[in-house]
């Protein structure tokens, strides 16, 4: 064999090896691209306290590992803090709304609760348990609770305050429902990925309060679906940040902004009209027409109220070709969310069949 032919032979081996490596790289790139496409990014949006964090907790219960005993124990302190926060809010409101205590000893109880530094609460001591129970049973405090739309009070207040005896027992372990009801304002961005039918659903929850929204911007890339939560029960409430602005008007303004963002042109929009259970209770004594004069349906009718609210949001969509998928939900009800998310998952997969190699 001549030197030239040997060199040609070596060269062709090198070329072959180089081609093989290139082919491997191309193959890996295609695989990476396909795998990236098999991840769906779901962005949870909505104003503060619309139920986004509760929705993520439900995904962990329904499609993830749920909450172990140790996980639940980690919520104990937060449950106690939620109880103190709720009673402090009512004690302050009693003063603002000039409501009198029926039982004289509750003035001292109110003072005792007021002086607690909630962030330092880690236990639920006997004297505080008694003070909170006595306050909650006071007709004055009950009147204050009935006027809760006039001040800021967590939706979970009644749930916890009517169950103080159970929560105050030695060795108390929060139930799944206790965990779902805990209110902790979301600061920053929380991601929860879960695997369904070989596809990763990456749910991203961003803080709903105004100060948190500027952090959203970098979440806007490659969003498969926008899941926008509206609290149906907020039609008569004002904002945490501004007490002369209606919460539902703020929610409408945010929804209008979101659906017209160019980033979301190709993202499907799913509207969750949440807290339907609270609406059913509230509509009996707080009339929708007092806050939205254009409502001409019957009073005390939850169905008419929610259909009106749905239409208000759907009418904000400027693009007649874009479908807005909607569901009425109760984020604290695991079975309701299981049922609704099964439908949502089917919708999302149907819309992404070709792109995700599902056909």
Swiss-Prot record:
Principal cellular location given in the protein's record: membrane
InterPro entries named among the record's database cross-references: Gprotein_alpha_Q, Gprotein_alpha_su, GproteinA_insert, P-loop_NTPase
Membrane topology: Lipid-anchor
Reactions the enzyme catalyzes: GTP + H2O = GDP + phosphate + H(+)
Positions with a binding annotation for Mg(2+): 53, 186
Residue numbers spanned by region G5 motif: 329-334
UniProt-annotated stretches for the region G3 motif: 201-210
Keywords attached to this entry: Cell membrane, Cytoplasm, GTP-binding, Hydrolase, Lipoprotein, Magnesium, Membrane, Metal-binding, Nucleotide-binding, Palmitate, Transducer
Gene Ontology CC annotation, any one: synapse
Protein known as: Guanine nucleotide-binding protein subunit alpha-11
The species this protein was found in: Mus musculus
Lineage: Eukaryota, Metazoa, Chordata, Craniata, Vertebrata
Protein encoded by which gene: Gna11
């Amino acid at each position: 064999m001549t030197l030239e032919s040997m060199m040609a032979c070596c060269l062709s081996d090198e070329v072959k090896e180089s081609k093989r490596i290139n082919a491997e790289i191309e193959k890996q790139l295609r695989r990476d691209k396909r795998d990236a496409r098999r991840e769906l990014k779901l962005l949870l949006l909505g104003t503060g306290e619309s139920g986004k964090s509760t929705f993520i907790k439900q995904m962990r219960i329904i499609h993830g590992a749920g909450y172990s005993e140790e996980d639940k124990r980690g919520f104990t302190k937060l449950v106690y803090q939620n109880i103190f926060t709720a009673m402090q809010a009512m004690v302050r409101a009693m003063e603002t709304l000039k409501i009198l205590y029926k039982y004289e000893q509750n003035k001292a109880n109110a003072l005792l609760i007021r002086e607690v530094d909630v962030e330092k609460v880690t236990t639920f001591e006997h004297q505080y348990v008694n003070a909170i129970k006595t306050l909650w049973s006071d007709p004055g405090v009950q009147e204050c609770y009935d006027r809760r739309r006039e001040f800021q009070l967590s939706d979970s207040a009644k749930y916890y305050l009517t169950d103080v005896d159970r929560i105050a027992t030695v060795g108390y372990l929060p139930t799944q429902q206790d965990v779902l009801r805990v209110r902790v304002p979301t600061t920053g961005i929380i991601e929860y990925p879960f695997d369904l039918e070989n596809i990763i659903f990456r749910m991203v929850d961003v803080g709903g309060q105004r100060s948190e929204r500027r952090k959203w911007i970098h979440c806007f890339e490659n969003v498969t679906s926008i899941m926008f939560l509206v609290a149906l029960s907020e039609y008569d409430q004002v904002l945490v940040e501004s007490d002369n602005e209606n919460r539902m008007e703020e929610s409408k303004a945010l929804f209008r902004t979101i659906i017209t963002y160019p980033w979301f042109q190709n993202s499907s929009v799913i509207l969750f009209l949440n807290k339907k259970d609270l609406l059913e209770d509230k509509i009996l004594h707080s009339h929708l027409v007092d806050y939205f004069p254009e409502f001409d349906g019957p009073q005390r009718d939850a169905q008419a109220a929610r259909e009106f609210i749905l239409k208000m949001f759907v009418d904000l969509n400027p693009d007649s070709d874009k479908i807005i998928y909607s569901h009425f939900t109760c984020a604290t009800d695991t079975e309701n969310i299981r049922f609704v998310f099964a439908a949502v998952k089917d919708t999302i997969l149907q819309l992404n069949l070709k792109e995700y190699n599902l056909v």
